[in-house]
């Protein structure tokens, strides 16, 4: 006479089978090559919007070319956008313009203006396009050029304490990275100076 299976064991077996099926379904739907902690290129706009809401005074956003180094300071987050650099710059500036709590201070590489077309094909057109984009923000933002290594050092130092978002692009022209330091959008340098002077007089 065949022995009947215990009802608890039968139920437990069914639960395990269901769990296994669910796990296989999740794995099948997961995008190929996805790994934990590595943002996918399609998500860079979402990540930018999420981070911008949290960012403030002394945070940075950098839009960099393909060969920009992966920095190791704990506060630096690098995302591969797999997108056009000028397009990413424009998107970042547009999003910052919509934010009331921050304003951009833009840094570009001082070397860029001296890179010859003969050594970097496309650099002339790039300079013109970037000037056009930054020209639209004239009067609304501060912009200055510094040597590339000096800017990287600024980011490396800031990344020890503050969050920095680096958006890596497909551009293959040197010294084209655009670095955006965020400042308080509702408190300017002149107001800060007056405040410090008032504090010093008391």
Language-model regions: role of each:
Residues 16-30:
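Bacterial N-terminal signal peptides
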Residues 35-86:
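Long, hydrophobic N-terminal alpha-helical segment
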Residues 1-12:
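N-terminal secretory signal peptides that target proteins for export/translocation
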Residues 108-114, 119, 123:
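Long, position-biased, composition-driven segments near the start of the mature protein
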Residues 119-202:
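Glycine-rich, aromatic-bearing surface loops/beta-hairpins
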Residues 69-70, 78-104, 124-148:
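Feature captures the catalytic cores and cofactor-binding loops of soluble hydro-lyases/lyases
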